[in-house]
């Protein structure tokens, strides 16, 4: 099953949710009869999973995004192209939005509207405002 199909389904094994605290799990997931957990409909309705060409982000109808995950992709591009892609993604975020990128995929990149998240487990940035 493809990654986008899995994301749209919004169903996760208990193992996948081990790092999610009980309060969040109870608030945002419904236990299923097969032992998996499904994202609650009110949250699932707010999620957009789309296949995009990162080299054509200017054409993508993306703006005001709350969260963007871009992991295990940037390593395939030259440094200048990575920066271009990251700048476009940063511009697509809503104020307070979160950009999560793969650890080790970005070195020395900064954007004037983004602030690094202080967490050693992830490489992420929030948009000012």
Regions found by a protein language model. Give the residues of each.
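Core SAM-dependent methyltransferase catalytic element
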Residues: 67, 108-129
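A short glycine-rich, Lys/Arg-flanked "PGG" loop and its adjoining helix->strand segment in the class I
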Residues: 83-95
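A generic structural signal for alpha->beta connector loops
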Residues: 44-46, 96, 113
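Pocket-edge structural micro-motifs
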Residues: 51, 103, 127
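Conserved beta-strand signature within the Rossmann-like core of class I S-adenosyl-L-methionine
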Residues: 95-103
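Bulky hydrophobic/aromatic packing residues
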Residues: 15, 98, 112-114
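Extended basic-aromatic, gly/pro-enriched interface segments that bind polyanionic ligands
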Residues: 1-69, 73-81, 106-108
């Amino acid at each position: 099953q493809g990654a986008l199909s899995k994301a749209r389904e919004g169903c996760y094994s208990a193992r996948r949710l081990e790092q999610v605290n009980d309060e969040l799990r109870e608030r945002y997931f419904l236990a299923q009869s097969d032992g998996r957990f499904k994202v609650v409909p009110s949250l699932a309705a707010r999620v957009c999973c789309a296949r995009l060409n990162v080299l054509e982000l200017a054409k993508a109808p993306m703006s005001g995004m709350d969260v963007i995950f871009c992991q295990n992709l940037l390593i395939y591009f030259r440094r200048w192209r990575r920066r271009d892609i990251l700048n476009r993604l940063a511009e697509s975020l809503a104020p307070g939005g979160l950009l999560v990128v793969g650890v080790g995929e970005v070195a020395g990149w900064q954007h004037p509207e983004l602030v690094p998240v202080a967490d050693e487990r992830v490489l992420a940035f929030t948009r000012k405002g």
